[in-house]
Amino acid sequence: RILSSMKEGEKVLDMFAGVGPFPVMLSSKAKLIVANDINPSAVYLLQKNIRLNHLHNVVPVLGDAMNLPHMLDSMKFDRIIMNLPFAAYGFLAGAAKLAAKGAVIHLYALVEKEGEHNEDILRAFPNAKITERFLRSYSPASWHAVYDIEVGDEV
């Protein structure tokens, strides 16, 4: 779904890359993918995944996502993946600093009701267009959801 919505040559940031499923999938269209994770074992396996899949446009980063705006300084990204369902919304302010004009952010979250994180999103991106999709049931009272956030030109 994300790959089909991408344009050729996008710069992508995966804030919580793990072993790299999103970077591997998106590398065919992206100009550059910065794949970050705080877990050294995950980054080691990400590097291995990059080698095994012959990916030349994926840059692995070992770091805390809270520090990414400082670490990546003036870089801006066309697409940001935030797949940390228990806590990704807590990193929206950092994502706002890294989003290019017109960027799309994919925020994965566990929710109990529709629109649960809209206020958090609108605090970081006041004029964003938000589309929420429920992916699957997580427990009897919660859902795994994705918020597709179209930033617009406000950044």
Name the predicted role of every residue range:
Residues R1-V155:
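Rossmann-like S-adenosyl-L-methionine
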